[in-house]
């Protein structure tokens, strides 16, 4: 299916010269003088090579048919990350390069959306928010509440983030998976 380049987003799959590419980032650039362009950073699915392409924003690009299906994360090992389709109980092994830095947020039993093209996993979409425990953070300093300040904290998955001063070690917090930012204290 042909679409205009400016409508492409991260995670979309395009076909170019008979090969499939997953879009890592898409940026619409509008220079003061000249034609607006869409800058695409893509990864070739067959061998993982990263390429950058520029298209005029109105240029037609072939978008590949990709099936998005819900899967449940089971475990990870040397072969990759293993997911199960909850309807058919079919298991899929996803290579580490497809998951990338999102691997830190995967938890056993987590429901994710896997993008598949002819049964081959291309991309993964995690839930927007995930609940994690703070394992380490600095103690609060009295009188530091005059301005809204945040302090560094290490989460149970090893990711470092900024949390409000009232959060202590052992507290469960809600984190955005897109950027690792603090949302709120968990309500459980």
UniProtKB/Swiss-Prot annotation:
Q: Which UniProt keywords apply?
A: Cytoplasm, Elongation factor, Protein biosynthesis
Query: Where, subcellularly, is it found?
Result: Cytoplasm
Q: Which stretches does the entry tag as region Disordered?
A: 139-163
- Indicate the principal place this protein occupies in or around the cell: cytoplasm
Quote the CDD domains the UniProt record gives. S1_EF-P_repeat_1, S1_EF-P_repeat_2
Q: Name one GO molecular function term.
A: translation elongation factor activity
Q: In its UniProt record, which GO terms are filed under biological process?
A: peptide biosynthetic process
Q: What is this protein called?
A: Elongation factor P
To which species is this protein native? Answer: Methylobacterium nodulans (strain LMG 21967 / CNCM I-2342 / ORS 2060)
Q: Which gene encodes it?
A: efp
């Amino acid at each position: 299916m042909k679409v205009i380049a400016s409508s492409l987003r991260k995670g979309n799959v395009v076909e170019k010269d008979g090969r499939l590419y997953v879009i890592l980032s898409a940026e619409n650039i509008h220079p003061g003088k000249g034609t607006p362009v869409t800058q695409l950073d893509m990864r070739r699915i067959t061998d993982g090579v990263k390429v950058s392409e520029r298209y005029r924003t109105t240029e037609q690009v072939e978008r590949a048919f990709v099936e998005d299906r819900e899967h449940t994360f089971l475990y990870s090992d040397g072969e990759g990350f293993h997911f199960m389709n909850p309807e058919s109980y079919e298991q899929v092994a996803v290579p580490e390069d497809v998951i990338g830095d999102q691997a830190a947020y995967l938890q056993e039993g987590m429901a994710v959306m896997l993008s598949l093209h002819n049964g081959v996993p291309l991309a993964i979409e995690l839930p927007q928010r995930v609940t994690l425990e703070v394992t380490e953070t600095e103690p609060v300093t009295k009188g530091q509440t005059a301005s809204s300040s945040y302090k560094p904290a290490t989460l149970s998955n090893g990711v470092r983030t900024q949390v409000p001063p009232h959060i202590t070690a052992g507290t469960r917090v809600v984190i955005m998976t897109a950027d690792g930012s603090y949302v709120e204290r968990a309500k459980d």
